[in-house]
């Protein structure tokens, strides 16, 4: 890969994510020009898993700091069968609790939240810290889009559910823990 191709691809993917999220994901809204960090972990996991599959790897899980690209399920050598990966979503109010489990053979999952890194996501519309959700998990075919949309849901909160009715997001699922009178609801 050349850096020019990577930059061009990332630029285009960021533009698509901005459009799909009504601007809630906007890497151009930061001072200094362009910050695609809400998309690149998922993009990197996709790229690495695609390289592995092209090299003949049938079963892989690529973890880019919690954003996962999953290919081919995992081989249970005891049972002699391929099973989907079981991926748990953590409760942001009690990190020892799993609140949802997804079974994924081929696809991606990304979670964005404030429970590990604190309030680090900026609402591009207001310039203030995003308070739309406590955590957002998106499951779908492409890690870059899961990553970007999970970031956008942190900005959009409950209003962001409408984005998942767009044809481009068919097959993508959202699971969010929202803020409500200082309590979490799912």
What are these model-predicted stretches?
Residues 3-186:
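Mature catalytic core of soluble alpha/beta enzymes
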């Amino acid at each position: 890969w050349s850096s020019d191709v990577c930059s061009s691809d990332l630029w285009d993917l960021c533009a698509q994510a901005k459009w799909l999220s009504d601007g809630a994901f906007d890497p151009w809204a930061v001072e200094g020009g362009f910050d695609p960090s809400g998309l690149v972990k998922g993009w990197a996991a996709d790229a690495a898993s695609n390289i592995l599959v092209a090299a003949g790897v049938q079963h892989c899980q690529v973890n880019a700091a919690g954003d996962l690209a999953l290919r081919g399920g995992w081989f249970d050598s005891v049972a002699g069968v391929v099973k989907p990966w079981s991926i748990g979503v953590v409760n942001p109010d009690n990190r020892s609790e799993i609140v949802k489990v997804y079974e994924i053979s081929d696809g991606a999952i990304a979670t964005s939240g404030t429970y590990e890194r604190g309030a680090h996501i900026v609402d591009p519309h207001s310039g203030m810290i995003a308070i739309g959700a406590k955590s957002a998990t998106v499951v779908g075919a492409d890690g870059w889009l899961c990553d970007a949309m999970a970031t956008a849901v942190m900005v959009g909160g409950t209003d962001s559910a409408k984005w998942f009715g767009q044809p481009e997001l068919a097959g993508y699922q959202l699971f969010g823990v929202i803020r409500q009178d200082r309590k979490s609801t799912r």
